Amino acid sequence: MSDNNKKSIAVLGAGPAGLMAAWRLRCAGFAVTLFEQEPVVGGMCATQTFKGRDGEYRFDYGGHRFITKNPELLAFIDELMGDELLHAERKSVIRFGGRTYDYPLNLPNLLKTAPLALMAGAVKDLLLLPFAKKPTDFAKASFAEWIQSHFGRTLYRQFFEGYTGKLWGINPDKLSADWAGQRISLIDLKDVARRLLPRRNGSISVRTYARKYRYPKYGFGQIFTTLGERLVAEGVELKTGATITRLEQADGRIERVYWKQDDVEQSAAFDQVISTLPLPLTCQHLGLPCDLHYRSLRFVNMPLKTENLSDNTWQYLSDPHILATRLQEPRRRSPFMAPQGQTSVMLEIPCNPGDATWQAPLSDLRGRVTADLASLGVDTAKLGDETFEARSEYAYPLMDLGYQARRNEAIKALMPITNLIMTGRQGTFRYIFTDTAMEMGMMAADMVIDGVDRRHAILNHRNENTVIETQSVA
């Protein structure tokens, strides 16, 4: 412990991975400085609180929930949060073409809701799928090819094509398929058929999303603010509002970390640097090239003067003419996300920095999404006139065709820096779940603690081609 105390560790970014790395390191006796650009910890998993006329409204940066198949991690979060960690159940629907479909799909709802042509096309696809040409290398396949080879063209056109294009901002035939196996719950059309057919005992054996999950009383970010408070109490130096500006390297090591806080640039030397910053930013701070990009989000959040909008946690909005991709009601996760007797809505709007949507005045966006909400059947007269917004510049790593080679080039350029560890969703440029990011943070800390190089293991952690949510113990 005394030797560890002499080693100083910089953790860049206080999201799930950075916080867990700092916790593990501090428990092992290391001196840890944790840097966070925002005023609060949590990164993309933070919760924002807005004070409206009728009370406080809380909004996450998207649809977060705590699920994991790691009993050790679950026990840690249970102990950390105690009675503040609630049990919740997810209910989701797909809105498309003026119809509302259950998600995941089920036969009674499809028979009641889907046009006859859709049902006929899906059955035809199922019969022809065994004879259809499939991509020979799914690592190089496009998302469009992957979906059609597993679901058939009819379901692809109905449920995936428009939504995916709107979310990622590129045509699905230009998007890589290598992440789909962990994110799409119906693995192939045979699974669809097994799901659609009713079971005698009512059970379903095919893979699907976890419906039950844990969620903090006051928003997902409460997990990370609570952990941040514990870290500070244990002696971690937490610097919020601190933007990393440069990483100085010499002889294969980062010698100094430079940051700006309160408009003053400062620097310090560290023995080891764990970076959860977006991978392109880490490269930029070291003067290295990196041709990787992100898809951004704007969130338009509005109070609603009614106790409940619906019983849906979120609604996928697949119609291309609707600006947002998801409509969420935070109160469905915890009743404490809105004042008593009221609720709120959150719309996720994909965009790119500098484009028309990113630059649009909030009043313009509100007008557009209000019209969209009305078309979805929401009583917009109950919205009032308050609007709260948030932005996430690095919401989704853009996994277009060929991104793997560009990611490998960036990682190869960083690997000679022996005291740098990239970890977490942003630091590894991976589209992963929160618990995986937390595990990556612990792995980075373990590398510092025992000196075993785990960088390649971290970069590929939980990269198996299976739906990760299906194995949740939370």
Task: List the model feature ranges, each with a label.
Residues M1-I9, C27-A28, T470-A474:
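Extreme N-terminal leader/targeting segments of oxidoreductases
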Residues K7-L34:
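N-terminal Rossmann-like FAD-binding beta1-loop-alpha1 element of flavoenzymes
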Residues R26-K51:
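Glycine-rich FAD pyrophosphate-binding loop
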Residues A28, T240-A381, N408-I411, L459-T466, ...:
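Mid-domain catalytic core of redox enzymes
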Residues T47, R58, L73-R95, T154-Q158, ...:
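A short alpha-helix-loop-beta-strand transition element characteristic
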Residues R53-P135:
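Dinucleotide-binding Rossmann-like beta1-alpha1 core, especially the glycine-rich loop
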Residues P115, K124-L247, A269:
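Active-site/ligand-binding neighborhood in enzyme catalytic cores
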Residues L401-A474:
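C-terminal lid/capping helical subdomain adjacent to the catalytic/cofactor pocket in oxidative enzymes
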